[in-house]
């Protein structure tokens, strides 16, 4: 006989759907789904994940607390949590074609920036030295960004950081200067990773530079991990000591992160033949928990396991090939329209447009594009002084490729971007000379009826609606 003691209203609170329980939140979610459906999503760090991943994310796996590692938890009842985490680890190694004797992986990291910090703390002391690609040159905040005025990233507070940069003329990483500066700075960690660098990284050269100063080579492949898993671009695993990645960008999984670490022999003494073994596994696992985190997000690990199975499929490889082909088509059309691209193009999933020769900044173009249902982001380009009004526009292909865009569609995107840039120039030119700030530009658009903006918004919404957003089954289940 049941001794259920909760009231019927409390029982209903636990069992009712979102729409029944909280219409206010449901309505906001409904509007966001509509925004995604009616928008051309060009943010390079975004993607459109699968129904199966959504199903795993919104599951009872979220109920369980599980500090520790599989087989060594601080709570009971984790036999199935252990099972899913081990499965996720195995699938991660398989997705990137790795030998478990040579590589291990931690799948508990909550996000990419914390994962990078966890690695740094695991392998070097406070005030240890780190070199990463400068943010305005295509790097990431978590690679130790700071300005002459302040330390921006917490990484630059805990560690001594020095940037390396691209050649201003070519837009390519200046490996020669990096090598010279590494000899002077002598970092403990050399980070090879980017957030707005469109060309391939020479991992072999990076390995040689790291070895010349006795540094660990840490590769942050957050943006390009899906391309690497599908072998569309070269893998860093042949050269790296540690590889980190987020899981929601080109990998098309849930929002999380992974840390891959070397196992086995690190080096052999040329004179004695004595082997030095890697000791990364325990250090990195300890840095993740208990160093920086408590219990992992088991629903995310479950969803990641699903995404990694998909990443090992032939369909996923075909998708990644299309991601790059679409980026190349976008590159070609933008060049035909007269635009300058940083590094003169792309080898990956995005292009970085240098708007400075045209006389407009990325912030204004980003804002106007948003008014016509195209979302992308302003981005610093080499030589920029301001992050708020940078000279670049970053355009990525993963999300719309997931929705079914092909090369002709991205050529059409380039035409829309071109029209937005021209509109920006017209609107700015219509303002008094003293009204030269972003707020003046935005106010003009907000208070004026500009027919072409309204026409483009409707045209793009209708066009985007013809490409499915893979949330329909989830949406119906949620009552949205």
From Swiss-Prot:
It is an enzyme of class 2 (transferase). GO terms for molecular function: glycine hydroxymethyltransferase activity; pyridoxal phosphate binding. Belongs to the SHMT family. Its main location: cytoplasm. The modification N6-(pyridoxal phosphate)lysine is found at residue 249. InterPro entries: PyrdxlP-dep_Trfase, PyrdxlP-dep_Trfase_major, PyrdxlP-dep_Trfase_small, Ser_HO-MeTrfase, Ser_HO-MeTrfase-like, Ser_HO-MeTrfase_PLP_BS, SHMT-like_dom. It is found in: Cytoplasm. The keyword Ubl conjugation does not apply. This is Serine hydroxymethyltransferase, cytosolic. NCBIfam families: PRK00011.1. Homotetramer. One of its GO terms (biological process) is tetrahydrofolate metabolic process. GO terms for cellular component: cytoplasm; mitochondrion. It comes from the Eukaryota. In eukaryotes there are two forms of the enzymes: a cytosolic one and a mitochondrial one. Its cofactor is pyridoxal 5'-phosphate. Pathway: One-carbon metabolism; tetrahydrofolate interconversion. Disulfide bonds: none annotated. Keywords: Cytoplasm, One-carbon metabolism, Pyridoxal phosphate, Transferase. It catalyses: (6R)-5,10-methylene-5,6,7,8-tetrahydrofolate + glycine + H2O = (6S)-5,6,7,8-tetrahydrofolate + L-serine. Interconversion of serine and glycine. Its EC number is 2.1.2.1.
């Amino acid at each position: 006989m049941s001794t259920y003691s909760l009231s019927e209203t409390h029982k209903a609170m636990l069992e009712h759907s979102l729409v029944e329980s909280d219409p206010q939140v449901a309505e906001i979610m409904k509007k966001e789904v509509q925004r995604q459906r009616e928008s051309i999503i060009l943010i390079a760090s975004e993607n459109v994940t699968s129904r199966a991943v959504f199903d795993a994310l919104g599951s009872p796996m979220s109920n369980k607390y599980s500090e520790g590692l599989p087989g060594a938890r601080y709570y009971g009842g984790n036999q199935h949590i252990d099972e899913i985490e081990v499965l996720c680890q195995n699938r991660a190694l398989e997705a990137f074609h790795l030998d478990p004797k040579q590589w291990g992986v931690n799948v508990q990291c909550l996000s990419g920036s914390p994962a990078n910090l966890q690695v740094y703390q695991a392998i070097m002391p406070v005030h240890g030295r780190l070199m990463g690609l400068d943010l305005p040159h295509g790097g990431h905040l978590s690679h130790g960004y700071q300005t002459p005025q302040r330390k921006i990233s917490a990484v630059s507070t805990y560690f001594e950081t020095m940037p390396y940069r691209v050649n201003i003329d070519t837009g390519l990483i200046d490996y020669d200067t990096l090598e010279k500066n590494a000899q002077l700075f002598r970092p403990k960690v050399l980070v090879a990773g980017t957030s707005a660098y469109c060309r391939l990284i020479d991992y072999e050269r990076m390995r040689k530079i790291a070895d010349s100063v006795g540094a660990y080579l840490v590769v942050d492949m957050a943006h390009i991990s899906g391309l690497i898993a599908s072998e569309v671009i070269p893998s860093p695993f042949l050269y790296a000591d540690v590889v980190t990645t987020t899981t929601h960008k080109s990998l098309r999984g849930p929002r999380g992160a992974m840390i891959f670490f070397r196992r086995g022999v690190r080096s052999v003494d040329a004179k004695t033949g004595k082997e030095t073994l890697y000791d990364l596994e325990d250090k990195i696992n300890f840095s993740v928990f208990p160093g920086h985190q408590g219990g992992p997000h088991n629903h995310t690990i479950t969803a990641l396991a699903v995404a990694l199975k998909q990443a090992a499929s032939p369909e996923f490889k075909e998708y990644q090939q299309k991601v790059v082909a679409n980026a190349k088509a976008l590159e070609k059309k933008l060049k035909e329209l007269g635009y300058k691209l940083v590094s003169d193009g792309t080898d990956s999933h995005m292009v970085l447009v240098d708007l400075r020769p045209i006389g407009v900044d990325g912030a204004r173009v980003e804002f106007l594009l948003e008014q016509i249902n195209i979302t992308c982001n302003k981005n610093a380009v080499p030589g920029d002084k301001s992050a708020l009004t940078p000279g670049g526009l970053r355009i990525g292909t993963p999300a719309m490729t997931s929705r079914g865009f092909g090369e002709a569609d991205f050529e059409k995107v380039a035409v829309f971007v071109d029209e937005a840039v021209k509109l920006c120039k017209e609107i700015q030119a219509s303002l008094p000379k003293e009204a030269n700030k972003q707020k003046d530009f935005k106010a003009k658009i907000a208070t004026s009826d500009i027919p072409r903006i309204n026409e483009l918004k409707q045209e793009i919404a209708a066009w985007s609606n013809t490409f499915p957003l893979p949330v329909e089954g989830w949406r119906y289940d949620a009552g949205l």
